[in-house]
């Protein structure tokens, strides 16, 4: 189990990042950049409310909290849609910051009092929750118009030439899908339980699809020919007027990114495409999207040892030697930038850079047991969602694993999502 010292470090790192993302004036925090997203001040107070609920009140909403019930209810994500939150009588930014600080002080006291053999999972869950909201706030900030508020604080390594369009073989046979709490104590409920599945051999892209490759799709009329699209995808394309990835400007040579207008790097993984677009691109390219089971095998399975790797590259914790994570770069890295991060089959950039769409709907693994936060996964099973894998440049390294499962509606584009192709053999 993760030590109290490590948990305290991860809590501090997440909070420092959160506060950087709300280090703006009140008007900025209280406005809504897009109906798809909450005002930043809602996310800030929601982070504190969930931390208080799980770490100070044992997950019992009936137990008195620091906020009046009517105020606390404003931060129930199931009761209030993102579009409606700007109209709610939310805490002011100053009160939200003060509330979060008060909760954090008490949470650290609770962590210090945790017995040596105590169950620290709920702390890991709260750390994951805050970091996931930090990525959500980055999505909101990317939708903002006007002069830039954010600037990258980390440089990216150079890519390698002739990586786009290449693929690697993933051998057929059984592998262990998912994880158990004993091996990954911080894993969330939908990642469990570990179980053996058989996967036929296939090929998978060595790297994600690039902007340059996507431009070829556009130039070849990919957005104007229904033959590449599913029936539902084509209907959505027509209704939404899609002609290029979100944030690409007319003409396809420049884009907006966090308020900056810039040239589109040809060797960077494409992002801000929906599942429908990813599906159409794959058909045009003579390929398909991987299932999430295929994706996890390509990422984590080592046929030489007949066992899972904790990370694609092995057991070492994620660093900028292996992957582009942590949100400091504000963009994906060029393909081929992380050869040391390759998986056993040779696939690169499986973690970080862009979330990767799979064909899989969100379903529980056999033996699924909901965690203490029962509404994390269960309400979304069987819904209109597609699973995304691998994380993005905006994900905190401490919460990401090959088994981590994200999901969203197939029409979503504001997320930092891209594409990796697969082929039958």
UniProtKB/Swiss-Prot annotation:
- Catalytic EC class: oxidoreductase
Which keywords annotate this record?
Iron, Metal-binding, Monooxygenase, Oxidoreductase
User: Cofactor(s) for this protein?
Assistant: Fe(2+)
Q: Name one Pfam family in it.
A: DinB_2
Q: Which PANTHER family match?
A: HERCYNINE OXYGENASE, SULFATASE MODIFYING FACTOR 1, 2
Q: What is this protein called?
A: Hercynine oxygenase
Q: Which organism is it from?
A: Mycobacterium tuberculosis (strain CDC 1551 / Oshkosh)
InterPro entries recorded: CTDL_fold, DinB-like, DinB/YfiT-like, EgtB, EgtB_Actinobacteria, Sulfatase_Mod_Factor_Kinase, SUMF_dom, SUMF_sf
Q: Which HAMAP family match?
A: EgtB (MF_02035)
This entry's comment on induction and repression of expression is: Expressed in log phase, part of the egtA-egtB-egtC-egtD operon, which does not include egtE.
Q: What does this protein do?
A: Catalyzes the oxidative sulfurization of hercynine (N-alpha,N-alpha,N-alpha-trimethyl-L-histidine) into hercynyl-gamma-L-glutamyl-L-cysteine sulfoxide, a step in the biosynthesis pathway of ergothioneine (ERG). ERG is one of the major redox buffers which protects bacteria against redox stressors and antibiotics; loss of ERG or mycothiol (MSH, the other major redox buffer in this bacteria) leads to respiratory alterations and bioenergetic deficiencies that negatively impact virulence.
Q: What is its EC number?
A: 1.14.99.50
Q: Which domain of life is it from?
A: Bacteria
What pathway is this protein a component of? Amino-acid biosynthesis; ergothioneine biosynthesis
GO terms of molecular function = gamma-glutamyl hercynylcysteine sulfoxide synthase activity; iron ion binding
Residues annotated as binding Fe cation are: 46, 129, 133
Coiled-coil parts of chain: none
Q: Which reaction does it catalyse?
A: gamma-L-glutamyl-L-cysteine + hercynine + O2 = gamma-L-glutamyl-hercynylcysteine S-oxide + H2O
Q: Which family does it belong to?
A: Belongs to the EgtB family.
Give binding positions for gamma-L-glutamyl-L-cysteine: 82-85, 408, 412
